[in-house]
Amino acid sequence: MHLRLISCFFIILNFMEYIGSQNASRGRRQRRMHPNVSQGCQGGCATCSDYNGCLSCKPRLFFVLERIGMKQIGVCLSSCPSGYYGTRYPDINKCTKCKVDCDTCFNKNFCTKCKSGFYLHLGKCLDSCPEGLEANNHTMECVSIVHCEASEWSPWSPCMKKGKTCGFKRGTETRVRDILQHPSAKGNLCPPTSETRTCIVQRKKCSKGERGKKGRERKRKKLNKEERKETSSSSDSKGLESSIETPDQQENKERQQQQKRRARDKQQKSVSVSTVH
């Protein structure tokens, strides 16, 4: 019984030594393949170096080289950072830097957002937009030029003058239209949205309600004018009446004139008598 236990113990011990030797040989092979490889990799690294960081990544992670001064460090990320695009290969998932003028990209030849000062057009970053397109400084993209669009004209309005449809022969009529699409910076300007033309209609008398305030005002002015005219006529007639003398006034006037003549004659006689003496 004791012999069996001792033999089992030695068998287990030999098996553990065998596993340890296998792990050691695997580590020596990895060190030969990747010099300076650290066995304590972190941050998603499958293999790594104390000097260069990650050398390979765990499945589904992307490998990217980050420059720190003159040194490049390998990093494993779940997605590529801004300015890089990801490509999956059978043995590695890799992040590759976009072009110099591109901020974010889908692949090497298709940019989705340009850096400041460039305009995006069909996946490329341009200094200026091609002919037939214009730059949108808000989205920093080359967009189509938009021209103004207007609706059809409305029917002509009724012939009117000073807001009324009666009391005149010559007036004006108007028609309008709406702007359906406003133009972009380089688009054609919008046309006028209203037109007015002269119209001639058969004169018709305004009803009391149609005369309105202006009609009442004209009527009031007419009445005031007639009243002033009547006042002027009455004052003229009074002046004329005052210039005509009544028979009594004429008789008194003649009597006064006779008295004046008698007094004059009497004075002349007295002067002649004094001269004779």
UniProtKB/Swiss-Prot annotation:
Cystine connections: C41-C48, C45-C54, C57-C76, C80-C95, C98-C105, C102-C111, C114-C125, C129-C142, C148-C190, C159-C166, C199-C206
UniProt-listed GO biological process terms: angiogenesis; blood vessel remodeling; branching involved in labyrinthine layer morphogenesis; canonical Wnt signaling pathway; limb development; positive regulation of canonical Wnt signaling pathway; positive regulation of non-canonical Wnt signaling pathway; sprouting angiogenesis
Entries under InterPro entries matching the protein: Furin_repeat, Growth_fac_rcpt_cys_sf, R-spondin, Rspo_Fu-CRD_dom, TSP1_rpt, TSP1_rpt_sf, TSP1_spondin_dom
GO function terms (MF aspect): frizzled binding; heparin binding; signaling receptor binding
GO cellular component term of the entry, any: extracellular region
Ranges: FU repeats: 35-86, 92-135
Main location: secreted
Sugar-bearing residue positions: N36
Record Pfam families: Furin-like_2 (PF15913), TSP1_spondin (PF19028)
TSP type-1 domain span: 147-207
Segment forming the signal sequence: 1-21
Consequence of gene disruption: Embryonic lethality due to vascular remodeling defects. Conditional knockout in endothelial cells results in impaired developmental and tumor vascular remodeling. Mice show endothelial cell apoptosis and vascular pruning, leading to reduced microvessel density.
Compositionally biased tracts (Basic residues): 213-223
Keyword field: Disulfide bond, Glycoprotein, Heparin-binding, Repeat, Secreted, Sensory transduction, Signal, Wnt signaling pathway
Subcellular location: Secreted
Record-stated family: Belongs to the R-spondin family.
Protein role: Activator of the canonical Wnt signaling pathway by acting as a ligand for LGR4-6 receptors, which acts as a key regulator of angiogenesis. Upon binding to LGR4-6 (LGR4, LGR5 or LGR6), LGR4-6 associate with phosphorylated LRP6 and frizzled receptors that are activated by extracellular Wnt receptors, triggering the canonical Wnt signaling pathway to increase expression of target genes. Also regulates the canonical Wnt/beta-catenin-dependent pathway and non-canonical Wnt signaling by acting as an inhibitor of ZNRF3, an important regulator of the Wnt signaling pathway.
Free-text comment on this protein's domains from its UniProt entry: The FU repeats are required for activation and stabilization of beta-catenin.
PANTHER family: NEUROHYPOPHYSIAL HORMONES, N-TERMINAL DOMAIN CONTAINING PROTEIN, R-SPONDIN-3
Annotated protein name in UniProt: R-spondin-3
